[in-house]
């Protein structure tokens, strides 16, 4: 019995998603496979990918430009949330998955499909992100996961595709698995599976090495309005152009490389290489502006919730209730995050050297140690007495207990 009649397949042009097309038809009895490839600013020429799907047996091969919503609806909220999974990874790949899932569901409705499919394997994070997102948006649609179920090794998958005339894009010279979009690149597999092997320079494309970076530093000014980046060096840019320019500037100075051991959703550790120059630069600038414009208790609370926000997105819960609630809190905090931050880029580093805001909570007359100081130093004694009272009472009780044995 056929698993489904008409399926919309998330398609990248890679080995797994290409093999999914004949596999769905010949092994699972699917009558019609419609593929969808998302343009997320990865820079690939998508016409060959579209044709490749047709050659593999797809009845329709669709390509959609999702760059603008990717930045405005997914990347910019992540910047506001200072989203860094495990304190480092800015979710460049994870942010794309709920958007692709949403578009898959929309296409399925438009063409009358009874299922959607993806080529994610059973060890990765993306299977979780797609399955959970689709289940939230369209619980009536089946989600077919051939790569998770077919039980073939990488070599066997390639051989299966060759039976149906599919060429393999992976050679011995380039054994890496690469995912890319406008926000960055993720690189894994091959020699990188040994966590003690230094990544060769050939795996990087968006950033130069620190050795090849300019000897002279460059100052960059980033402007924000309500927590959203709006300008670079005084020039207002649309969201997509701003990300491109941030990538260019940071990448040209070797900033934005990550080499980390990451805890996947499925419980294993993986070694990941990331290039995310612009996104990391913007998050760093945004964090600094918040330190100037948010009250201390709000800032501390937000820093705690940012980690949870990043965990939720990484774990595929973009459309979940907790993230929705956190979005409301973050939105409220951003009303006063207005101003600019100056950052010095130099040979792999990005150092904040200045920040300014009309909503600044920094009061020079209170902070100065000069003659203009308006802080009432005499008030400190009473404050410290009350502040330290609980500690003194606890210490006294501890001494009494010790005295009586």
UniProtKB/Swiss-Prot annotation:
Taxonomic lineage is: Bacteria, Bacillati, Cyanobacteriota, Cyanophyceae, Synechococcales
Task: State which pathway it belongs to.
Answer: Amino-acid biosynthesis; L-arginine biosynthesis; L-arginine from L-ornithine and carbamoyl phosphate: step 2/3
- How does the annotation summarize its subunit structure? Homotetramer.
The gene name reads argG
One GO term in the molecular function aspect is: ATP binding
Q: Which GO terms describe its cellular component?
A: cytoplasm
Output the NCBIfam families linked to this UniProt entry: argG (TIGR00032), PRK00509.1 (NF001770)
- Origin species, per record, is Synechococcus sp. (strain RCC307)
Cross-referenced Pfam families, in alphabetical order? Arginosuc_syn_C, Arginosuc_synth
User: For binding L-aspartate, which residues are annotated in this chain's numbering?
Assistant: 121, 125-126
Query: What family is this?
Result: Belongs to the argininosuccinate synthase family. Type 1 subfamily.
List the Gene3D superfamilies hit by this protein, alphabetically: Argininosuccinate synthetase, chain A, domain 2, HUPs, Single helix bin
Q: Which reaction does it catalyse?
A: L-citrulline + L-aspartate + ATP = 2-(N(omega)-L-arginino)succinate + AMP + diphosphate + H(+)
Instruction: List the protein's name.
Output: Argininosuccinate synthase
């Amino acid at each position: 019995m056929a698993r489904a009649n008409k399926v919309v397949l998330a398609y990248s042009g890679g080995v797994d998603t290409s093999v999914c097309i004949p596999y769905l038809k010949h092994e699972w009895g699917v009558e019609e496979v419609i593929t969808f490839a998302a343009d997320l600013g990865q820079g690939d020429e998508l016409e060959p990918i579209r044709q490749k799907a047709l050659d593999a047996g797809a009845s329709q091969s669709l390509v959609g430009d999702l760059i603008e919503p990717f930045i405005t609806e997914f990347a910019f909220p992540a910047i506001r949330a200072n989203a860094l999974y495990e304190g480092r990874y800015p979710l460049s790949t994870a942010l794309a998955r709920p958007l692709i899932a949403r578009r898959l569901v929309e296409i399925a409705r438009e063409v009358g499909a009874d299922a959607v499919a993806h080529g994610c394997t059973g060890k990765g994070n993306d299977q979780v992100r797609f399955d959970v997102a689709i289940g939230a948006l369209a619980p009536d649609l089946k989600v077919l996961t051939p790569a998770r179920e077919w039980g073939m090794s990488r070599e066997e998958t390639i051989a299966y595709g060759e039976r149906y005339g599919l060429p393999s894009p992976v050679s011995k010279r380039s054994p890496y698995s690469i995912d890319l979009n406008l926000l960055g690149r993720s690189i894994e597999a091959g020699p990188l599976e040994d966590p003690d092997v230094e990544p060769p320079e050939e795996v990087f494309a968006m950033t130069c090495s620190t050795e090849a970076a300019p000897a002279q530093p460059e100052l960059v000014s980033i402007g924000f309005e309500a927590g959203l980046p709006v300008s670079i060096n005084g020039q207002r840019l649309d969201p997509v152009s701003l990300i491109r320019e941030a990538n260019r500037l940071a990448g040209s100075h070797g900033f934005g490389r990550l080499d980390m051991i990451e805890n996947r959703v499925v419980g294993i550790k993986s070694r990941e290489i990331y290039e995310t120059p612009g996104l990391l630069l913007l998050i760093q600038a945004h964090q600094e502006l918040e330190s100037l414009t948010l009250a201390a208790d709000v800032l501390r609370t937000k820093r705690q919730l940012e980690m949870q926000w990043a965990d939720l997105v990484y774990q595929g819960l973009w459309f979940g209730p907790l993230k929705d609630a956190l979005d409301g809190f973050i939105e409220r905090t951003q009303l006063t995050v207005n101003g600019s931050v100056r950052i010095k880029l130099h040979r792999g580093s990005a150092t904040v050297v200045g920040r300014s805001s009309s909503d600044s909570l920094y009061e020079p007359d209170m902070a100065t140690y000069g003659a203009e100081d308006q802080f009432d130093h005499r008030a400190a004694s009473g404050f410290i007495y009350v502040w330290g009272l609980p500690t003194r009472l606890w210490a006294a009780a501890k001494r009494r207990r010790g005295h009586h044995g």
